[in-house]
């Protein structure tokens, strides 16, 4: 009868529905168990692509599936990415913030969903984070100063171009450089901000050269300012003044290899990504992790 056929179809449908429900649960659990989520500020910058590649390699090694979402340097997109991941039942979140303040909302959203958060490269000023992984900027500043001492000698006359006041990078790199200043008894002629900017680096350096023509070495807290300072020195015919940058950007490393920049302190973004996944693995296994993991840097000089 028609009723029998309907009953049979309903039974089939019920079986089908429960099968679908079961597979949905299984896939949610599979995602939750073996997946680490990584939200990157932008994949339009080689630095962060390296960070992602390092994370991917470590995830493959440890047997995790890595889900990567790109925030396209937009805090609203970043928040949407994190919301998407909380709905998907992510067990742990690695986030490289678009902005230290703006990321607070995304971190708090993950906190409310009881998802542990690990920040990479940039810190979050709000919300709870289990661990922060970034380059050891203090050590980098000291390495730069030590190299200047090696080449220009103890007691060298130096100028420091500082980054944007208030940023952790400028504060920490400056602190490390000050350690070298004390150790090598440098005569610091001037320390002035040029806001991590190439044009400002050029202008500030031109002004400082007028006041301090006897400078022997310049430490710029990033490669952009270093390249600006280099231009000012070239224009003034002072090619004997050594300039040391920081970051190891493609332009910075090229200037080192061309013999223009004395050195740059390169960050290792792939290691930041790898350390992030390694730390996530520990958190998922219930092991204790440090609140902060400093990642090594390397001195790049002409080969």
PLM-predicted stretches and their roles:
Residues 4-15, 22, 26, 30-303:
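A residue-level marker of the well-folded mature domains of exported/periplasmic proteins
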């Amino acid at each position: 009868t028609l009723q029998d056929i309907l009953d049979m179809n309903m039974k089939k449908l019920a079986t089908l529905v429960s099968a679908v429900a079961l597979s949905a649960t299984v896939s949610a659990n599979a995602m939750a168990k073996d997946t680490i989520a990584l939200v990157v500020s932008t994949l339009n910058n080689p630095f962060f692509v390296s960070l992602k590649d390092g994370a991917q390699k470590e995830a493959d090694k440890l047997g995790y599936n890595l889900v990567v979402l790109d925030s396209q340097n937009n805090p609203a997109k970043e928040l949407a990415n994190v919301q998407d991941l909380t709905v998907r039942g992510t067990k742990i979140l690695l986030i490289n913030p678009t902005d230290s303040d703006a990321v607070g909302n995304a971190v708090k959203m993950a906190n409310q969903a009881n998802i542990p958060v690990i920040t990479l490269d940039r810190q979050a000023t709000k919300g709870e984070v289990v661990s922060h992984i970034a380059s050891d900027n203090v050590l980098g500043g000291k390495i730069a100063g030590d190299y200047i001492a090696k080449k220009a000698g103890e007691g060298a006359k130096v100028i420091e171009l500082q980054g944007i006041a208030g940023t952790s990078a400028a504060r920490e790199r400056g602190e490390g450089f000050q350690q070298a200043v004390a150790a090598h008894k440098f005569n610091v002629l001037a320390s002035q901000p040029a806001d991590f900017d190439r044009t400002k680096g050029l202008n500030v350096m031109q002004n400082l050269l007028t006041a301090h023509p006897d400078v022997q070495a310049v430490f710029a807290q990033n490669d952009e300012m270093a390249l600006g300072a280099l231009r000012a020195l070239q224009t003034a015919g002072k090619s004997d003044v050594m300039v040391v940058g920081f970051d190891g950007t493609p332009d910075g490393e090229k200037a080192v290899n061309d013999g223009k920049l004395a050195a740059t302190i390169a960050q290792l973004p792939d290691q930041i990504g790898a350390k992030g996944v390694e730390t996530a693995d520990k958190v998922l296994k219930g092991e204790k992790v440090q609140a902060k993991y400093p990642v090594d840097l390397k001195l790049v000089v002409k080969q």
